[in-house]
A protein has these predicted regions:
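The N-terminal extracellular segments of secreted preproproteins, especially immediately downstream
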Residues: 1-3, 21, 360
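Bacterial N-terminal signal peptides that target proteins for export
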Residues: 2-13
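Gly/Pro-rich cap/lid or specificity-loop segments adjacent to the active site
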Residues: 26-304, 358-511
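Short alpha-helical "patches" and their helix-cap loops
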Residues: 234, 323-343, 371-380, 486
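P-loop NTPase catalytic cores that bind/hydrolyze ATP
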Residues: 302-335
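Long, low-complexity segments enriched in small/aliphatic residues
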Residues: 334-367
Length: 511
């Protein structure tokens, strides 16, 4: 599941909030306002692009709904583009990820994103769209979260209370906004409106993580407009809350290679990394622990860590999988200070992006899947953090549950390429395996040792596979697509302390 993201507002965005309200009054639903600019590619050649605002109803179910802006950009394909090639609509993840700064920002991430967009020129037109409610050309809906206490361990009870409080705070903070208009159906409607405004009959979809869920919503609610799709780190409409045993299996796959890394051998207990995980679970299930550490300003801070904090920690440091074994082994050998510092940072008040829980509460979960979640054999290890707060607070958020008719998969003949890593702990690989039977024209590429990443990053060592994906987007041809890709074993990080003389658990020491 995606995290309830912390807000980040790029500097160039702030000026956009000064745009006069009359700019919206001059437009009607479905209008676009476009500016034309140019960037230079890696060869120094000028590439023209359009950047603009799509004006859409905040809630299409209400005739008097106010208009909101959604940012988008388009890079047109070369004149040599094959006639009839559908444009690729690139859907960002998150939710709560602004991306249009890639045209002007100079940081490495923005430059890499722009390079990836320009590469789509070999397919045809590329259209990038941001997300309603968190877009550089419209509203950025956030609230300030409340801090969590240091003097008791993290708990599901506190998490539920925090989620419910956030829902009430969101409604109070935006009395002039219709927050019920931020359901997954409205996100899908924005794609259809932009397609129509730009004059396309059919489109292709490209997205990962929430972008994949967004794409699946478009295919479910507007199937006639989609020619084909490429989705990665897949999050099905009924899988917003991850099955704990599927997530745990991803950890087991990382541990398999870590157990065979010579550099980690001196730190491993008998039974390997998963034995360390089990020992940590037993340790923190027995009693919480108070850890004292120094903050950046030198001040001492004490924080209580318990079983719930450990359950959440087991999934930290997994995006960069090479870091995870060293993190777990540090905890196993009772080096808690760095972890305590991370938890303390997470407990501080920070801005929260609202479109995540608004979209999640609109999708919810089927009764059958909720039963599986609550009876999953890995709950003891990972807890109910991934879903309890969302389910308990769903009625507090203004978006309406769209029901099983939308979230449960149906058979579709849209050709889709799924790309999924088996080390993904945010959207486990089983998500793709469960969806594949509903896509008779689907093709899955399973990436061994792939994490929660975008399609082309997962295929970074496979140029032929990348070209085959571009070819699929251009023509629909699947013959060159592999079934499986294997990434090399990563160079696992080593704990920052010297190996113990024995890999047995050291005696408890005062913190």
């Amino acid at each position: 599941m995606r995290s309830f993201g912390k807000a980040y507002v790029p500097r160039f965005v702030l000026a956009l909030f000064l745009l006069p309200l009359c700019a919206f009054a001059q437009h009607k639903a479905g209008d676009i306002a476009v500016e034309r600019h140019a960037v230079h590619d890696e060869k120094g050649q000028s590439v023209e692009y359009e950047i603009g605002t799509l004006y859409v109803p905040e809630n299409r179910h209400k005739p008097d709904s106010r208009l909101i802006g959604v940012g988008f950009a388009r890079i047109k394909g070369p004149a040599s583009t094959r006639p009839g090639t559908p444009p690729v609509f690139w859907l960002p993840g998150g939710p709560g990820l602004t991306v249009l700064g890639a045209f002007s920002d100079t940081d490495a991430s923005s430059k890499a994103r722009l390079r990836s967009w320009l590469a789509f020129g070999q397919v045809g037109d590329l259209v990038v769209i941001e997300q309603r409610g968190y877009t550089t050309r419209g509203d950025m809906l956030t609230i300030a979260s409340k801090p969590l206490p240091d003097d008791r361990p993290g708990s599901i009870r506190d998490d539920v209370a925090s989620m419910r409080a956030d829902a009430k705070a969101a409604i109070a903070a935006y009395p002039d906004k219709d927050l019920s208009g931020y359901d997954i159906g409205e996100f899908a409607g924005d794609i259809d409106d932009l397609r129509r405004a730009l004059g396309y009959e059919k489109i292709s979809l490209f997205g990962g993580s929430f972008g994949s869920q967004w794409a699946l919503a478009v295919m479910r609610l507007h199937p006639g407009i989609v020619s084909r799709a490429v989705i990665s780190s897949v999050e099905p409409l009924n899988n917003g809350y991850d099955m704990p045993s599927h997530v745990y299996a991803s950890l087991q796959r990382i541990a398999y290679d870590a157990d065979r890394a010579p550099s980690l051998a001196p730190y491993l207990p008998q039974g390997g990394l998963m034995a360390a995980v089990k020992a940590l679970h037993e340790r923190f299930a027995a009693t919480p622990l108070t850890v004292t550490f120094k903050e950046d300003n030198g001040a001492k801070r004490r924080i209580v860590l318990g079983e719930g904090d450990l359950q959440q920690a087991l999934l930290s440091h997994t995006q960069e999988s090479a870091e995870w074994p060293a993190f777990i082994l540090s905890l196993y050998h009772r080096h808690y200070e760095a972890w305590a510092r991370e938890v303390a940072s997470d407990r501080k008040p920070e801005p929260r992006i609202l479109i995540g829980p608004l979209a999640d509460s609109s999708l919810g979960v089927s009764a059958e899947r909720e039963h599986l979640l609550r009876t999953d054999p890995a709950l003891d290890m990972l807890g109910t953090w991934n879903f309890e707060g969302n389910i308990a607070s769903a009625a507090d958020w203004p978006t309406v549950d769209m029901g099983d008719e939308v979230r449960k998969p149906v058979v579709t003949d849209i050709p889709v390429v799924f790309i999924h890593g088996d080390w993904d702990t945010s959207t486990p690989m089983e998500n793709t395996l469960g969806l594949l039977p509903y896509f008779p024209k689907g093709h899955a590429i399973l990436v061994h040792r792939g994490s929660h990443d975008g399609a082309f990053y997962q295929l970074r060592n496979e140029p032929a596979a990348k070209q085959a994906v571009y070819g699929f987007l251009a023509t629909g041809e699947t013959s060159g697509l592999p079934l499986e890709v294997t990434l090399p074993v990563p160079d696992f990080e080593v704990p920052s302390f010297a190996p113990p003389t024995s890999a047995s658990v050291p005696p408890a020491r005062s913190s």
